[in-house]
Amino acid sequence: METSSKGLLTQVTQFWNLLDDLAQSDPEGYEKFIQQQLKEGKQLCAAPEPQLCLQTRILKPKEKILFINLCQWTRIPAPQSTTHPVPLTVGKPEDTTEISDAYTVIDVAYNPDVLHAAEKDQVKKNQLIQMAMKCIEEKFQFTLSHSYHITKFRIKGSIQRMKQNLMGIQTDSIDLREKMRRELTLGQIRSSTMSNPDHFPQLLLPKDQVSGKAVCLIEEISSTEIQVEMKMPAYELKIVHDHSEKPLKIELKVELPGINSVSLCDLSVSEDDLLIEVSEKYRLHLNLPKLIDTEMTTAKFIKEKSTLIITMPLV
């Protein structure tokens, strides 16, 4: 133990000597180095932020509504390249019961650059969502419905709850960044170490800042695992008007080559969007131009033409 401590002290002393030399020989380089360390430390302490929320269903082991909060978090590294696995972390499921219904919330975090790249690319966004759902299924042994829709709110539940879930620490006490401001400066660490070689300053978090929960491990989902990329089928959407040019309904015709049964089609419709998934071959998600009456919506499958026709009366 004594030998190990002396070896560590030697390394620390060498490190400070290198910093002293750098400060004298290259003040600009020294300043850049210090700023880089502060930047990386700030990123490490940064909290996850909500990006979007999607709603789907848990089918097994017990059917229930599921909300997935997709968050951005600088602590999650970006993939090294487009061919490398995409890192993400998944929080534990949290069940909530309200007056009218019960549902589960799961928080998932990606690197901010990964989510920003998918903001205007529906294909990339769908891949990230499918990766998150696949990871949830494998991690918790769930079977999820592959139909989902993005909600109008960015997060289900409070931001504080999401941070506690993903970070594994309490965030309602003094901000962690305030703790960092109280940390010993580099000069103090150096002088303290040199004056008393047996003492190494430590930054200790108070008891209310430490949680018994382990921080979630980052899991990597390789992009090669999501090779079953469903194609967007050809479709025609039109608004049907009456004689006075008043809009009555929306008609959507979707061509599904190779599909000969309506049982292979999974259709989900809300007031303002529509999702069609067909036997892991086709996927079509549309934001509708007008609000529709979901209860009066009908669908007809023409087997001879492999065509699905959906009629959606307007509200």
Curated annotation (Swiss-Prot):
Sample GO molecular function, one term: small GTPase binding
Gene Ontology CC annotations of this record: cytoplasm; protein folding chaperone complex; R2TP complex; ribonucleoprotein complex
InterPro entries per UniProt: PIH1/Kintoun_subfamily, PIH1_N, PIH1D1/2/3_CS-like
Protein species of origin: Homo sapiens (Human)
Gene behind this protein: PIH1D2
GO process annotations (BP): box C/D snoRNP assembly; protein stabilization; rRNA processing
Positions of disulphide bridges: none
Similarity annotation: Belongs to the PIH1 family.
Protein name listed in UniProt: PIH1 domain-containing protein 2
